[in-house]
Amino acid sequence: MDQLRQSLLEAPIIEKGDYEYFVHPVSDGVPVLRPELLREIVIKIIRKVEVDNVDKIVTPAAMGIHISTAVSLMTDIPLVVIRKRQYGLEGEVSLSQQTGYAENEMYINDVRDGERVLVLDDVLSTGGTMRAVLDALDQIGAEVVDTVAVIKKAGPNELDESDHDVKTLINVRVTDGTVVIVDSNGDG
């Protein structure tokens, strides 16, 4: 059974202003994240990317952490979390994260020029977070081997015109209070 697809079809919908927002264990931490769903996601990610050529997994805090940790455990690839807190460590790079909902500063540590990275996140919506992360990694000189978002919300995003391709596991949209599956195989 396709746990990810089914869980999205059953996801509660809330309204934030004029925006319909699905509440999902992958993107929000509620309802409860079942281990079989997380396992399915990790297996799909590992099958979709070339993990043999990756030095580090990079993910923005907070909702990419559980997915990236599970992938790290399965592949033995070290994990770097892009934090919202500045530590002032040598080599720390700041980036400005702008989403459809908020704007924040984030900080990358422990990624160096020439390192090959896999970027993972929970959802690709406006593309603001992913664009900022990829631009910062380019600035550092890291080689982005692959980029994966578990769920893509259909519609234009900031990466449509970029040089970076983002693979996804499933593409959805929310219409009239319901999650609609646009592509059950995602992009890439």
Swiss-Prot record:
It comes from the Archaea. The keyword Nucleotide-binding does not apply. GO terms for molecular function: transferase activity. Keywords: Purine salvage, Transferase. The keyword Transferase applies. GO terms for biological process: purine ribonucleoside salvage. Its EC number is 2.4.2.-. It holds the Pfam family Pribosyltran. It is an enzyme of class 2 (transferase). May catalyze a purine salvage reaction, the substrate is unknown. Belongs to the purine/pyrimidine phosphoribosyltransferase family. Archaeal HPRT subfamily. PANTHER family: HYPOXANTHINE/GUANINE PHOSPHORIBOSYLTRANSFERASE, XANTHINE PHOSPHORIBOSYLTRANSFERASE. HAMAP family: Hypx_phosphoribosyltr. This is HGPRTase-like protein 1. It comes from Haloquadratum walsbyi (strain DSM 16790 / HBSQ001). The lineage of its organism: Archaea, Methanobacteriati, Methanobacteriota, Stenosarchaea group, Halobacteria.
